[in-house]
Amino acid sequence: MQIYPLRLLPNKIDFDFMNFKKVSYTFSIILSLISFIWIGIYKFNFGIDFAGGIVIEVRLDQAPDLPKMRGVLGKLGIGEVVLQNFGSERDLSIRFGSNSEENLMKNIELIKGSLQSNFPYKFEYRKVDFVGPQVGRQLIEAGAMAMLFSFLAIMVYIWVRFEWYFGFGILIALVHDVILALGFMSMTKLDFNLSTIAAVLTIIGYSVNDSVVIYDRIRENLRKYHKKNITEIINLSINETLSRTILTVITTLLANLALILFGGEAIRSFSILVFFGIIVGTYSSIFISAPILTMFVNRKFNKKVIER
């Protein structure tokens, strides 16, 4: 039995992506500036991981229903509330932010009252600790270093596999994706916490993967078509990989949509940010990282790339 590959688009498609190069550059610059300005004015909605807060340690008489608990405490209007098991499944850590001593005591009592009235468990409150913002600053620095090292590792990989100017194209696209992702977080007031740092790193990985697929096809077509100029080759390469790109986007967006709808509050910020980042990363792979090669690549300069 013969198996046919799934294709959303015809085999021969000839859309002129490069014709929109200036428009896409202008559009991306405007969005990046808006993101910068918005972040500068409205900042981020830092979660407990970065802003500090209160940690309540509780032991219950049985394993709690964590998703239901998160839903109940999330409706109290006191901001982000993080629930985690530690030690045994009956030991529970409850974390939330507090900006004053008055709110601190009020919110602790509010949480205790809500748990007692909504759940049939016996609660033994063992400890209440304050986590200062100093820990948050250390986490911010660690998150920034993680992104920096990921950028450097990606640049080395692209330089070894292709050439330095391919790496430059991906670097510009990644900076664009990260700026827009951070701007989106600021605009939507998503909690800025460790899970959103993981989401940004996921976006970086997805965007690089998409760009490498197109770059591979560009290199292959440079070997095949000696008389075509670089603009024609980039257009051809994007069109040839477009069906794969669309299928990948659809499947990953559907998976993220399921996480947004059914994953619960614990991974909501992560799922929404990755959903947005997949769209932005796909756009940047087609309209930024590939077209930017025209600034560097010509037939004479391509020799090293073709031979690799």
Curated annotation (Swiss-Prot):
The chain crosses the membrane at residues 28-48, 140-160, 164-184, 194-214, 246-266, 272-292. Gene3D superfamilies: Multidrug efflux transporter AcrB transmembrane domain. One of its GO terms (biological process) is intracellular protein transmembrane transport. Pfam families: Sec_GG, SecD_SecF_C. InterPro entries: SecD/SecF_arch_bac, SecD/SecF_bac, SecD/SecF_CS, SecD_SecF_C, SecD_SecF_C_bact, SecF_bac, SSD. The keyword Cell membrane applies. GO terms for cellular component: plasma membrane. GO terms for molecular function: protein-transporting ATPase activity. It comes from the Bacteria. It is found in: Cell inner membrane. It is a multi-pass membrane protein. SUPFAM superfamilies: Multidrug efflux transporter AcrB transmembrane domain. Keywords: Cell inner membrane, Cell membrane, Membrane, Protein transport, Translocation, Transmembrane, Transmembrane helix, Transport. Belongs to an operon consisting of at least secF-nuoF-lepB-rnc. Belongs to the SecD/SecF family. SecF subfamily. PANTHER family: PROTEIN TRANSLOCASE SUBUNIT SECF, PROTEIN-EXPORT MEMBRANE PROTEIN SEC. Forms a complex with SecD. Part of the essential Sec protein translocation apparatus which comprises SecA, SecYEG and auxiliary proteins SecDF-YajC and YidC. Part of the Sec protein translocase complex. Interacts with the SecYEG preprotein conducting channel. SecDF uses the proton motive force (PMF) to complete protein translocation after the ATP-dependent function of SecA. This is Protein translocase subunit SecF. The gene is secF.
